[in-house]
């Protein structure tokens, strides 16, 4: 075996090992979820997380206090708050985005999908609306100060456009908002 081939082979084995370690670290991450005992969509989100390899513990005590302690503002609020590996996760954030967060390890409070958009994990149904997964960089940031971490827009995929084809009235009615 030539040295060049051996080096390429060694790098490949090393990369596969690192990938396996990252997957294993994510798969062994325990998610602590704070929610209302009567919230059905929260239970569906917990199922989504478990289906994606996470260990999940639920605390049916509500999420208002833990949301505040975690540094998530009311403007970014949803029906449940989760804690995983030092990050706060607010609302119906897809498991893939949480895995990406745990892999990239940015300096941040965590992620949020504010309100309860139709089509998010736990909010599945016949209706699917566009939504953003927001990166919360600093405690108590408002919605306008966050960064879009990922965008889910079923309209853009169907039409080939980057803007949703929903009317303004449809967009405004597409989210189940929390009561203050």
Regions found by a protein language model. Give the residues of each.
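Bacterial N-terminal signal peptides that target proteins for export
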Residues: 2-14
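N-terminal signal peptide c-region/cleavage motif recognized by signal peptidases
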Residues: 22-23
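Local sequence-structure signature of Cys/Sec-based thiol-disulfide redox active-site neighborhoods
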Residues: 27-52
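Loop/turn elements at helix/coil->beta-strand transitions in domains of secreted/extracellular proteins
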Residues: 28, 55, 107-109
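Short beta->alpha connector loops
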Residues: 37-38, 62, 116-117
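N-terminal, post-signal-peptide region of Sec/Tat-exported proteins
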Residues: 46-94
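Thiol/selenol-based redox catalytic cores and closely related redox-interacting motifs
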Residues: 75-168, 172-180
